[in-house]
Amino acid sequence: MSRRSTNEGRLTRPNPVYRNRLVNMLVNIILKNGKKSVAYRILHEAMKTIQQKTKKNPLAVVRQAIRRVTPNVAVKARRRGGSTYQVPVEIKPDQGKALAVRWILAAARKRPGRSMAFKLSYELMDAARQTGNAIRKREETHRMAEANKAFAHYR
């Protein structure tokens, strides 16, 4: 048995405006070069756009988008006998949520358009409607795991 202690993991504090940990997680991943105020502005503008376009609570739209993009399984590369296998592994909920947020932001950054806030708001709305590049990425990951199910015993 290992003598090493397990990592407790940090508690993320809730966002001051929305009082939500998920929003704070989004802000921290949007963050570039330590400019947190810029990240907050981007997210708050995106939330306003979502509110105006959908006439729904923007927090509910964000939650739904992240829930729909969160993957259940992923593939990990494992070397065995000189060849590399893509082995499907289950993902913990927190890890899946972090992946979902990263995929949504990557898809938003790739979008053509004006500001990052505008692109992020549209990507979140698309993800909530189960369209968009982030959803495509999740489906692609699930397809990859399904295709490599035969290698599941290599964990």
UniProtKB/Swiss-Prot annotation:
It is found in: Plastid, Chloroplast. Coiled coil: none annotated. GO terms for cellular component: chloroplast; small ribosomal subunit. GO terms for molecular function: rRNA binding; structural constituent of ribosome. One of its GO terms (biological process) is translation. Part of the 30S ribosomal subunit. NCBIfam families: rpsG_bact. Belongs to the universal ribosomal protein uS7 family. This is Small ribosomal subunit protein uS7c. The gene is rps7.
